[in-house]
């Protein structure tokens, strides 16, 4: 008689443990799904902010280019204008990476291509901010 109770209790404990393990696995998978959704939302927000920043920089660069295009320019202003035009081309290539030069992307895997565009963004943003600062300083000063 005691043997039957021992088997019944052992079976009850084993089934309870199996249910708890199954529940733990389900909660972990649900947590993973929520974490993944959060990461997607964060990436979406980051992409939107980056896109807005690029658009703002392009608009400001176009405005400065138009300002320098109208009227007489000094040699320094001419150089700034050339740099702004180069920046505009680079910003356009960032907006349309699939249309970027095939020479840059031929033979690279996807990760190398992503790194190439990230480096290009960093290379562009620094000089753009410097050019904008100089141009605004020239306009205000």
UniProtKB/Swiss-Prot annotation:
Record GO biological process: defense response to bacterium; defense response to fungus; killing of cells of another organism
Cellular-component GO terms for this entry: extracellular region
Entry keyword annotation includes Secreted: yes
InterPro entries: Bombinin (IPR007962)
Ranges in a coiled coil: none
Modification Leucine amide, positions: 140
Signal peptide interval: 1-18
Localization per Swiss-Prot or TrEMBL: Secreted
Keywords, comma-separated and alphabetical: Amidation, Amphibian defense peptide, Antibiotic, Antimicrobial, Cleavage on pair of basic residues, Fungicide, Pharmaceutical, Secreted, Signal
Pfam families: Bombinin (PF05298)
Residue ranges of the TM segments: none
Tissue expression as described in the entry: Expressed by the skin glands.
Propeptide segments, given as residue ranges: 19-43, 74-123
Sites bearing Asparagine amide, chain numbering: 70
Similarity comment: Belongs to the bombinin family.
Something else known: BLP-7 is also encoded by another gene from the same species (AC Q9DET7).
Protein name stated in the entry: Bombinins BLP-7/H-BO
Species for this entry: Bombina orientalis (Oriental fire-bellied toad)
Phylogenetic placement of the source organism: Eukaryota, Metazoa, Chordata, Craniata, Vertebrata
């Amino acid at each position: 008689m005691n043997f039957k109770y021992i088997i019944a209790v052992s079976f009850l404990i084993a089934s309870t443990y199996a249910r708890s393990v199954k529940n733990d696995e389900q909660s972990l998978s649900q947590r993973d799904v929520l974490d993944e959704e959060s990461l997607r939302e964060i990436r979406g927000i980051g992409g939107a902010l980056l896109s807005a920043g690029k658009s703002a920089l392009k608009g400001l660069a176009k405005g400065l280019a138009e300002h320098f295009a109208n009227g007489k320019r000094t040699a320094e202003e001419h150089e700034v204008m050339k740099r702004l035009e180069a920046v505009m081309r680079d910003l356009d290539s960032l907006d349309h990476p699939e249309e970027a030069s095939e020479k840059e992307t031929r033979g690279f895997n996807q990760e190398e291509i992503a790194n190439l565009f990230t480096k290009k963004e960093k290379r562009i943003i620094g000089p753009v901010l410097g050019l904008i600062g100089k141009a605004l300083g020239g306009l205000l000063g």
